[in-house]
Amino acid sequence: MIRRPPLSLLDLEAAPLGSRWALTAVLDALPWNSDGLIAAIAQQHDSGEVLMLAWMNRQALGETLASGQACYWSRSRRCLWRKGESSGHRQRLIEARLDCDGDAVLLLVDQQGPACHTGRPNCFYNAIRDGAVEVISSPLKDSRHDS
């Protein structure tokens, strides 16, 4: 049974295993920031590699869920950003999950090519080590940047 009444995120915390809520009711309860955004973390579904952090508005999240392809909100361009639209480096959605506070969404994806606009496999290639920042990943060969 899918529950449809207005809810708070505390209802989800207290819900027993297998409880289901209408998506619109949950989206209405999320603490979208003042710009109407929520943090979105993309993770490779089979390896667990964290690929990137981006932002989603409700429209981007809805499009991602409907199309099965990651769509984000570009804060700099102020428009929807369909990941891989220009580069071909798409993220096929396997599953979406909300964190306990409802202020972040985890996208388990199948990444096609590099995830980072620099051509690297992920956006976390600057390691903070021993008081310095060290670049730990090179761009992949034949990568087309995603802008």
Curated annotation (Swiss-Prot):
<feature type="binding site">
    <location>
        <position position="100"/>
    </location>
    <ligand>
        <name>Zn(2+)</name>
    </ligand>
</feature>
<dbReference type="GO" id="GO:0004635">
    <property type="term" value="F:phosphoribosyl-AMP cyclohydrolase activity"/>
</dbReference>
<feature type="binding site">
    <location>
        <position position="103"/>
    </location>
    <ligand>
        <name>Mg(2+)</name>
    </ligand>
</feature>
<protein>
    <recommendedName>
        <fullName>Phosphoribosyl-AMP cyclohydrolase 2</fullName>
        <ecNumber>3.5.4.19</ecNumber>
    </recommendedName>
</protein>
<keyword id="KW-0460">Magnesium</keyword>
<keyword id="KW-0368">Histidine biosynthesis</keyword>
<comment type="similarity">
    <text>Belongs to the PRA-CH family.</text>
</comment>
<keyword id="KW-0963">Cytoplasm</keyword>
<keyword id="KW-0378">Hydrolase</keyword>
<feature type="binding site">
    <location>
        <position position="101"/>
    </location>
    <ligand>
        <name>Mg(2+)</name>
    </ligand>
</feature>
<feature type="binding site">
    <location>
        <position position="123"/>
    </location>
    <ligand>
        <name>Zn(2+)</name>
    </ligand>
</feature>
<keyword id="KW-0862">Zinc</keyword>
<dbReference type="GO" id="GO:0000287">
    <property type="term" value="F:magnesium ion binding"/>
</dbReference>
<dbReference type="InterPro" id="IPR026660">
    <property type="entry name" value="PRA-CH"/>
</dbReference>
<comment type="pathway">
    <text>Amino-acid biosynthesis; L-histidine biosynthesis; L-histidine from 5-phospho-alpha-D-ribose 1-diphosphate: step 3/9.</text>
</comment>
<comment type="function">
    <text>Catalyzes the hydrolysis of the adenine ring of phosphoribosyl-AMP.</text>
</comment>
<feature type="binding site">
    <location>
        <position position="116"/>
    </location>
    <ligand>
        <name>Zn(2+)</name>
    </ligand>
</feature>
<dbReference type="InterPro" id="IPR002496">
    <property type="entry name" value="PRib_AMP_CycHydrolase_dom"/>
</dbReference>
<dbReference type="GO" id="GO:0005737">
    <property type="term" value="C:cytoplasm"/>
</dbReference>
<dbReference type="GO" id="GO:0000105">
    <property type="term" value="P:L-histidine biosynthetic process"/>
</dbReference>
<comment type="subunit">
    <text>Homodimer.</text>
</comment>
<keyword id="KW-0479">Metal-binding</keyword>
<dbReference type="GO" id="GO:0008270">
    <property type="term" value="F:zinc ion binding"/>
</dbReference>
<dbReference type="InterPro" id="IPR038019">
    <property type="entry name" value="PRib_AMP_CycHydrolase_sf"/>
</dbReference>
<keyword id="KW-0028">Amino-acid biosynthesis</keyword>
<feature type="binding site">
    <location>
        <position position="99"/>
    </location>
    <ligand>
        <name>Mg(2+)</name>
    </ligand>
</feature>
<dbReference type="Pfam" id="PF01502">
    <property type="entry name" value="PRA-CH"/>
</dbReference>
